[in-house]
Amino acid sequence: MTKAVLTSISQLALKALLYEVSLSPKPGLVDRFDNGAHDDMSFMTFIDSMIALSPFFQAYIETGFAYAKEEPLLLFNRLRQLGQKAEETMFCATQGINTHKGLNFSMALLLGATGAYLARTPHLMTDLGCFSKEDTLAICRLVKPMTAHLIQTDLGHLNTKKEFTYGEQLFVTYGIKGPRGEASEGFTTLTDHALPYFRQMISQNDPETSQLRLLVYLMSIVEDGNLIHRGGIEAWKGVKADMRLLLQQDLSTTDLRLALSSYNQCLINQHLSPGGAADLLALTFYFAFLEKLL
């Protein structure tokens, strides 16, 4: 019974990744229509990556459930070790292409926290149908003590390094904390912005329109390390401003799709891809499935 419930939730995480890549059109991003601003990956690359990561999603939630009483830092270390193995498996499946590195990190923490939370709330194990937005908030809050050390430990001593990872370079150059920062704050962009917005949208619109509007909203607010890495601060600010204007127009679904298709070509021409917004889109979908919004 327990394993079946945990398996079903891990499959929601996989489903969230599938929904994210399948949503189309997504400016600058890989979707069903084209590869966006990416010349090294395609829709099929993402499928390969998801299949590789799927067993680890199961392992993350089972680890959280099994070690729910453990100190948060110890649970984090277990999840990180699993996450590193997952990352290696992903890179093997994609022939070295980074499709989901940041999202895998976030999913490891949130699935681990989901498992730990379920171990403490046995009524949900027998009736996931009563999962609420309060449960979502509680799960995200569990991540905070697990990752409170992360910025100092991972990014606090970079002055001694000669070579940086992509995320480290963003922190050194711009002070962007990326997924580490989001996690260490308890995923507040998710709980305070993305999910409330999506709950409102889905109550007023069909699922596809709601998902597209959510993407635009996220592109208008997210501190997107991928955009900044590719185009700098001004390019990122420009995308945010463009998306704010698009939101204000309150377009029909047909016109919104046309606008996003046009903007896709604009970002392709600038080699810009809002990968940070895409990751938060997938995380929003995960909790939307748990809350039965989708």
From Swiss-Prot:
The keyword Transferase applies. GO terms for biological process: prosthetic group biosynthetic process. It catalyses: 3'-dephospho-CoA + ATP = 2'-(5''-triphospho-alpha-D-ribosyl)-3'-dephospho-CoA + adenine. The keyword Transferase applies. One of its GO terms (molecular function) is ATP binding. Its EC number is 2.4.2.52. Keywords: ATP-binding, Nucleotide-binding, Transferase. HAMAP family: CitG. Belongs to the CitG/MdcB family. This is Probable 2-(5''-triphosphoribosyl)-3'-dephosphocoenzyme-A synthase.
